[in-house]
Amino acid sequence: MIVLTRRIDESDTITGTVTLDVDSRIKSRLRVTLDDGREAGLMLERGHLLRGGELLADAAGSQVVRVLAAPEAVSTVRCSDPHLLARAAYHLGNRHVPLQIQPGLLRYQHDHVLDDMLRGLGLAVEAEQAPFEPEAGAYQSAPHSHSHAHDHPFVRLPAHS
């Protein structure tokens, strides 16, 4: 089995591709089947959403695999009115919905309840199959810490009454 342990920026040779939905692309440890049928394991650092087009390599750099974002069931809102689109983004964000944001477009994993809510705001919602690339904040794909320059060797738990 190929073990992919690191992300790389570029490579002259791509030895395979793997097509993954967003739920698989948020995992740092995962057994996958490459598009050519070979087995591979992802052993990556945590806290990073894999994006379509990213390159993964094994420790030696002899295997380089391109990640492809799989088409999946999504709801897409297209709107030329920025105020209406901002209202939709506000209501979806208030519900902590992972959201793909592009000029004139919002996309989220298909949910008929959310579709109906947005239609109630006057937006047209289309259910479709498309790659889903949500904003990084939904999955903390940037380094994140709660550190503030000193350690807490022990955590005090609240007393139970």
Swiss-Prot record:
User: Cellular component GO terms, alphabetically?
Assistant: cytoplasm
Ordered alphabetically, the record's keywords are: Chaperone, Cytoplasm, Nickel
Q: Which GO terms describe its molecular function?
A: nickel cation binding; unfolded protein binding
From which residue to which does any coiled coil extend?
A: none
Under which name does UniProt file this protein? Answer: Urease accessory protein UreE
Q: Which organism is it from?
A: Pseudomonas putida (strain W619)
| Superkingdom as given in the UniProt entry | Bacteria
Q: InterPro entries in the record, alphabetically? A: UreE (IPR012406), UreE_C_dom (IPR007864), UreE_N (IPR004029), UreE_N_sf (IPR036118)
